[in-house]
Design a protein with these regions (language model features):
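12-transmembrane solute porter fold
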Residues: 27-50, 63, 139, 182, ...
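Structural signature of transmembrane alpha-helices in multi-pass secondary transporters
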Residues: 34, 41, 70-73, 77, ...
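Extracellular/periplasmic helix-loop-helix junction of adjacent transmembrane segments
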Residues: 51-80, 119-121, 320-325
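Central cavity-lining transmembrane alpha-helices of secondary-active solute carriers
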Residues: 71-85, 136-140, 327-339
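Helix-loop-helix hairpins in multi-pass membrane proteins, especially solute transporters
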Residues: 89-220, 408
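Hydrophobic transmembrane-helix bundles of small-molecule transporters
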Residues: 180-293, 299, 317, 324-325, ...
Length: 483
């Protein structure tokens, strides 16, 4: 059985640095279902933000209940993304992709029919979350394998990450339109219809490698890593209810994560294949880029939840009004994404990521200052536009730096880790910023400001991490994978 790296080096999917080489038309058509899959998964993570009031009233729950459903969805994605990536070798990349789509679709329909919060969490958070964890790793692995020259691959990654950012930013607008025109349940039916269309489009997908059922799978590592992440994030969610429970869950989560890495080291010393190789954490450039990637999604989802909840719960805006305000962020991300390739030709990856953080932080400051001085909902638009531009400028460069820090044979592993880190950032953004907001709803203006200040401080950490990246960070893989 040839490995992923062997096929890329020796087979018809041979790697080339020829900037003129272009993928064939059939290969370019394969990008459509992959990009749509990333779009709908990102959309699912943000569209519920504008339904907070509608869902809480219809299901007789609270704002915190809806926050929990959103956070658990993002958390399940993060917790199972690496195991999902490992299963692609065992089951096949296309098979995992389609299975994930089917599970996601079932979860969307179950959510649409949910009679209460429990079924909503089962359908949206669990089924859709696990489905996403199965289908997203193949998106990035297949893109790496099918787009074999560096220029077309960078362009393909730009399309996919751009669609992810647009899905996350457009989620409130589309979700708001559907919720106001029909019902919040129709938004989940919309997701199921898009997923069905992707399943049809994926019939033309080709998997360059056959599945290998003998590929080892580290079940213990999967349980330890997933349980650790779940405990940490759920502990953060409990901070406004019981600090002792929160501290206990976070402590257990940290112990489980430490136990996971000890387990991985033991597996490697025994010559066995762990869930995640420790080699992935020995690359300083990749580590820094992963930090920036995590914080980018933390800021995007944190700002989306805080602004959406504040507009609906405090200002009394409905779903469509809230969604329309978020068109500013959507326009910013879309505009910056369209310019990403041109900017990458003129500036280093580090410069783009640093600039993105500076613009995003400026947007958060504007959100703080204008909202305090101006009661109109449009006071949010300038800040959201800046945040969209900043995030759109740096989402693709961060992915490029991470993926390019490793040789071809490690692309599957680093892709899974990269997606896990991004989704963990999304869940932390909703959990941390949302908890700061919800805990102080008795004094909403103060709690809104506190949540934004927390996000700004985290954004500063991302700016520092990006400044530490090598000045020549590029999209060219190193020979050894270590820098």
């Amino acid at each position: 059985m040839q490995s992923f790296g062997d096929v890329l080096r020796d087979g018809k999917y041979e790697m080339t640095d020829n900037p003129v080489a272009r993928p064939s038309a059939p290969v370019r058509r394969m990008l459509l279902p992959l990009a749509l899959a990333q779009f709908i998964c990102s959309f699912a993570g943000s569209n519920m933000n504008v339904m907070i009031n509608d869902i809480s009233v219809d299901l007789d729950t609270t704002v915190q209940g809806v926050q929990t459903a959103i956070t658990v969805f993002l958390l399940v994605m993060a917790a199972f993304m690496i195991p999902g990536g490992k299963l692609t070798d065992r089951w096949g990349r296309k098979r995992c992709f389609v299975a994930g789509l089917v599970l996601y679709g079932v979860g969307a329909l179950l959510s649409a029919a949910a009679p209460g919060l429990g079924i909503l969490i089962l359908g949206n958070s669990i089924f859709e979350g696990i489905g996403t964890a199965l289908l997203i790793p193949p998106v990035y692995i297949l893109t790496t394998m099918l787009f074999t020259d560096m220029k077309s691959r960078a362009r393909a990654f730009g399309v996919i990450t751009g669609m992810g950012g647009i899905g996350a930013a457009a989620g409130p607008l589309i979700g708001g339109l559907i919720t106001t025109a029909i019902d919040w349940r129709a938004a989940f039916v919309f997701q199921a219809l898009i997923v069905a269309a992707i399943v049809v489009l994926s019939r033309g997908l080709e998997d360059p490698l056959p599945p290998d059922p003998t590929t080892p799978f580290d079940g213990i590592g999967a349980v330890l890593s997933a349980a650790g992440l779940v405990c940490i994030v759920m502990g953060i969610l409990q901070a406004d209810n019981a600090l002792s429970v929160s501290a206990t869950l976070i402590g257990i989560g940290i112990l489980l994560v430490v136990g996971f890495f000890l387990h991985v080291r033991r597996f490697e010393r025994a010559g066995r294949v762990p869930l995640l190789s420790t080699d992935l954490f020995r690359n300083r450039t990749s580590n820094l880029a992963l930090v920036t990637q995590n914080i980018q999604w933390l800021l995007l989802m944190g700002v989306a939840f805080v602004v959406s909840a504040f507009l609906q719960v405090v200002r009394g805006y409905n779903a469509i009004e809230t969604g329309v305000i978020f068109t500013a962020a959507t326009a910013g991300i879309l505009g910056a994404s369209l310019l990403a390739e041109r900017l990458a030709d003129r500036h280093s990856q580090r410069a783009l990521i640093m600039s993105g953080f500076v613009v995003t932080l400026a947007g958060i400051v504007v959100l703080l200052l204008l909202v305090r001085a101006w009661t109109s909902a449009w006071a949010f638009a300038p800040g959201l536009l800046l945040i969209g531009v900043g995030l759109g400028a740096m989402l693709t460069p961060s992915v490029n730096v991470v993926q390019s820090a490793f040789p071809e044979e490690q692309q599957g592993e680093i892709s899974g880790l990269s997606r896990c880190v991004s989704n963990l950032g999304s869940s932390l953004g909703t959990a941390v910023a949302g908890t700061v907001l919800v805990v102080g709803l008795a004094t909403p203006n103060r709690s809104y400001a506190a949540a934004m200040i927390v996000l700004a401080c985290i954004g500063l950490v991302g700016l520092v991490a990006s400044a530490l990246l090598p000045a020549t960070s590029s999209a060219t893989p190193s020979a050894s994978g270590a820098q």
